[in-house]
Amino acid sequence: MKLKSLLLRYYPPGIMLEYETNGELKTKSIDLLELDPSTDVGALVEEIQKAEPLITASRAEKVRLLVQRLQAKLEQNSKHIFCLVKVLRAHILPLTNVALNKSGSCFITGSYDRMCKVWDTRSGEQLHTLEGHRNVVYTIAFNNPYGDKIATGSFDKTCKLWSAETGECYHTFRGHTAEIVCLSFNPQSTLVATGSMDTTAKLWDIQSGEEVFTLTGHLAEIISLSFDTSGSRIITGSFDHTVIVWDTSTARKVHTLIGHCAEISSSVFNWDCSLILTGSMDKTCMLWDATNGKCIATLTGHDDEILDSCFDYAGKLFATASADGTARVYCTATRKCISKLEGHEGEISKISFNPQGNRLLTGSSDKTARIWDAHTGECLQVLEGHVDEIFSCTFNYKGNIVITGSKDNTCRIWC
Amino acid sequence: MGLLSILRKLKSAPDQEVRILLLGLDNAGKTTLLKQLASEDISHITPTQGFNIKSVQSQGFKLNVWDIGGQRKIRPYWRNYFENTDILIYVIDSADRKRFEETGQELAELLEEEKLSCVPVLIFANKQDLLTAAPASEIAEGLNLHTIRDRVWQIQSCSALTGEGVQDGMNWVCKNVNAKKK
């Protein structure tokens, strides 16, 4: 085995090793999920050396520099103050969701006006209009990290796959018998998964445009789905109060997570795929062992339905957003609530961490989005200006751009 | 509200929930009517550029009322909201005689929609507080409502501003939902 090169992954922090074995080029990653600004780099490098034979003594200095770079990246943009740079009168009807490509150079908006539009983030210029759906474009996604394709899921029961560069429609995926309300590309960007009000999810082949599998088993609408980091499993969250873990290569049910006593609102894996976090209308969120499907913890405290939940990129923290107008941040290891985000004057329907994991972004029916310190719960900024409730908000991968989409038919770019 | 609540209101409603679609030309008074139903302040109402949704309890039902903007350029999108509609409420500005033909046309097109077939329709002859308002009987005749045979219908004069007649209309709604849901 011969090490060829070392590459960095900023968020979550990791070092990719490209190495040669029997004439074949392979890669593996050293995940540094515990890395934080106070980590003793010297000790960490020693640990890496012990665990990874490819990192020989001669490479140690190089690795030390890389870890320091990763450490610096975790603090990058942490003092960033967001300013409104553009208001885009994007659609003639309310927006649904927004999504950025990995570099943040462009983003997409879906709307009740049946269109998806592609925008240049810097100039605010409209690059493409993706037209063809016959009803609300509800769920949208880029195939990040590549960013050359866009998938749109509509109330017209179809999903369309588009070229992000030309706006050309490659495929229309037909087969669902009710509204498509969630979708995701797998990490390899070979499949699109769609979840529907028809109680099924489907996997589609991007190349051929054919249906690969139908995931049948839920008893009510599927409203959330996500792949794990490797793409080998997918979870679906349903109004039937359960979450199902599926094997994507066979469409077999691996586990059914039973425990919530009301509709599921969100379901996600952490980065290393050891845990699943679910939020529910029953006002609780639950942590599950992804390997055996057992519930590890039930987190109570919210006074109303949980509308969204998420892990940070490394999986060290997770957060919940509630109709009670507050959000909470928990430490994954201890499952203790470390901060409460209080200040919104309406329900919080969206929550996400910045990739560095030290900030949170929330979107609310009070027409504002807010930026919070993840550790102290202090509200750092109120992004004001929308004249109707915010339906969606998102950070870019660098954590220095925020896009908000609203029922007021506009989207706003904050940098 | 949030997108998730919209999805919850989208699915076919359980027995005690009723999905009501509120349509009509711009300036007919749909949003005022919606706010009147929800007992909210009606002093600052601007043209609806999208939609408003409110849930009101009435006679043991939870009425989920969808108020959809009526401007010409967004009327083609009304059909986004047709799915699972239990009752259609069509609102007319009874004082705007110049637009009776236009409103009649839109109503006729709605009644042709497959997804709304057999859905009971209540027509509110709104703005009866205005002196120039045409009476409900005149509107019924002008719009040829008596030719509607594929569903139950009713015309009710009202003033969304004062609230007069609104409850009578909603009583009719509940009565006809009863018939449908049982």
From Swiss-Prot, chain B:
SMART domains: ARF, SAR. GTP binds at residues 24-31, 48, 67-71, 126-129, 159-161. One of its GO terms (biological process) is mitotic cytokinesis. CDD domains: Arl3. SUPFAM superfamilies: P-loop containing nucleoside triphosphate hydrolases. It is a peripheral membrane protein. InterPro entries: ARL2/3, P-loop_NTPase, Small_GTP-bd, Small_GTPase_ARF/SAR. Mg(2+) binds at residues 31, 48. A lipid is attached at residue 2 (N-myristoyl glycine). One of its GO terms (cellular component) is centrosome. The modification Phosphoserine is found at residue 5. It comes from the Eukaryota. Pfam families: Arf. The keyword Transmembrane helix does not apply. The keyword Translocase does not apply. PANTHER family: ADP-RIBOSYLATION FACTOR-LIKE PROTEIN 2-RELATED. NCBIfam families: small_GTP (TIGR00231). Found in a complex with ARL3, RP2 and UNC119 (or UNC119B); RP2 induces hydrolysis of GTP ARL3 in the complex, leading to the release of UNC119 (or UNC119B). Interacts with RP2; interaction is direct and stimulated with the activated GTP-bound form of ARL3. Interacts with SYS1. Interacts with ARL2BP; the GTP-bound form interacts with ARL2BP. Microtubule-associated protein. Does not interact with TBCC. Interacts with RP2. Interacts with PDE6D; the interaction occurs specifically with the GTP-bound form of ARL3. This is ADP-ribosylation factor-like protein 3. The gene is ARL3.
